[in-house]
Curated annotation (Swiss-Prot):
Textual note on the cofactor: Binds 2 Zn(2+) ions per subunit.
The keyword Disulfide bond is assigned to this record: no
Disulphide-bridged cysteine pairs: none
Binding, an alcohol: T49, H69
Protein name, as recorded: Alcohol dehydrogenase 2
Organism: Zea mays
Note, other: In maize there are two isozymes.
One GO BP: formaldehyde catabolic process
Assembly and binders: Homodimer.
Length: 379
């Protein structure tokens, strides 16, 4: 492309300080260096993780910063050494990567790349420790290696999934984070058998994606657990057959679920990050074969406490990161699940706004009114 090797000026939504409205600015985006790719973003979605780091209540604030990590785009140019993608390819940026060289990448069991796994504090490129974004010479920091709230962004090639160019980017862009995390937690880690009983704790976007996984696996009973009763109606679209609100009972919810299911559920997936919900999700699975999978991120001081007999009675507890998907290897196959009409993505997309109205997307999520809001880069 004519822009290859040159600085590109474009619009980006910049977070200058915690909790303040994002500002649409003209930024300069430098060309990609070795093993980097410059992407033209066409659609980006808002994930709760973006809101969390925008609020910056519990972590080191890194500002000014360009947030955003769920997106779909087209390769504009590539840096030295990049052979996996070429200009014109359709890609999904991912907040974690796959170098294909480390022990994790070579293991069939892991997706936690030594080189490129998520780093929320790093605001620069891994190659030279510098930002590719500037405004009037001032560096603007990156976010989890993606920074998709910009018309152009620079990403390490290991954090890009090359996908079917026929796939609609305004739909499959949501597979770059939360939806794949929940879906994979069920399909790749919990692995419920057809006809089994599955409990999903927390019915936000990730929990509903885990529920979608249970539906695809053929579970016969899918029990949604949430303290907001309004979530049940929406959850039915994702296969939810029953709903339990812990607040409606005067005993621990794990006891309620054990009674409901004649001894416990076959599989549970916990998507809240609340440590008590994690304990409940583990203790509610059936002895002998039950498996609980933890997805939600806990507070740093949380302690998981349960009696060791729960393990000796052959209940299994697992954790997962990004649904155990390797970004480059596996995400293209998840896109194909959508293309084959197995995986339904439209029901996750509740809102769509032009990029210039990005603060509206934040407002919708803060009010709990949206699952996924898609932002169109071209107003």
């Amino acid at each position: 492309m004519a822009t290859a090797g040159k600085v590109i000026k474009c619009r980006a939504a910049v977070t200058w300080e915690a909790g303040k409205p994002l500002s649409i600015e003209e930024v300069e985006v430098a060309p990609p260096q070795a093993m980097e790719v410059r992407i033209k973003i066409l659609y980006t979605a808002l994930c709760h993780t973006d809101v969390y780091f925008w609020e910056a209540k519990g972590q080191t604030p890194v500002f000014p910063r360009i947030l955003g990590h769920e997106a779909g785009g087209i390769v504009e140019s590539v840096g030295e050494g990049v052979t996996d993608v070429a200009p014109g390819d359709h890609v999904l940026p991912v907040f974690t990567g796959e170098c294909k060289e480390c022990a994790h990448c070579k293991s069939e069991e892991s997706n936690m790349c030594d080189l490129l796994r998520i780093n929320v504090d790093r605001g620069v490129m891994i190659g030279d420790g510098k930002s590719r974004f500037t405004i009037s010479g001032q560096p603007i920091f990156h976010f989890v290696g993606t920074s998709t709230f910009s018309e152009y962004t620079v990403i390490h090639v290991g954090c890009l999934a090359k996908i079917n160019p026929e796939a609609p980017l305004d739909k499959v862009c949501i597979l770059s984070c939360g939806i794949s995390t929940g879906l994979g937690a069920t399909l790749n880690v919990a692995k419920p058998a057809k006809g089994s009983t599955v409990a999903i704790f927390g019915l936000g976007a990730v929990g509903l994606a885990a529920m979608e996984g249970a539906r695809l696996a053929g579970a016969s009973r899918i029990i949604g657990v949430d303290i907001n009763p309004a979530k049940y109606e929406q959850a039915k679209k994702f296969g939810c057959t029953e709903f339990v609100n812990p607040k409606d009972h005067d005993k621990p919810v794990q006891e309620v679920l054990i009674e409901l299911t004649n001894g416990g559920v076959d599989r549970s997936v916990e998507c809240t990050g609340n440590v008590n919900a994690m304990i409940s999700a583990f203790e509610c699975v059936h002895d002998g074969w039950g498996v609980a999978v933890l997805v939600g991120v806990p507070h740093k001081d949380d302690q998981f406490k349960t009696h060791p007999m729960n393990f000796l009675s052959e209940k299994t507890l697992k954790g997962t990161f990004f649904g155990n998907y390797k970004p480059r290897t596996d995400l293209p196959n998840v896109v194909e699940m959508y293309m084959k009409k197995e995986l339904e993505l439209e029901k996750f997309i509740t809102h769509s706004v032009p990029f210039s109205e990005i603060n509206t997307a934040f407002d919708l999520m803060l009010k709990g009114e949206s699952l996924r809001c898609i932002m169109r880069m071209e107003d």
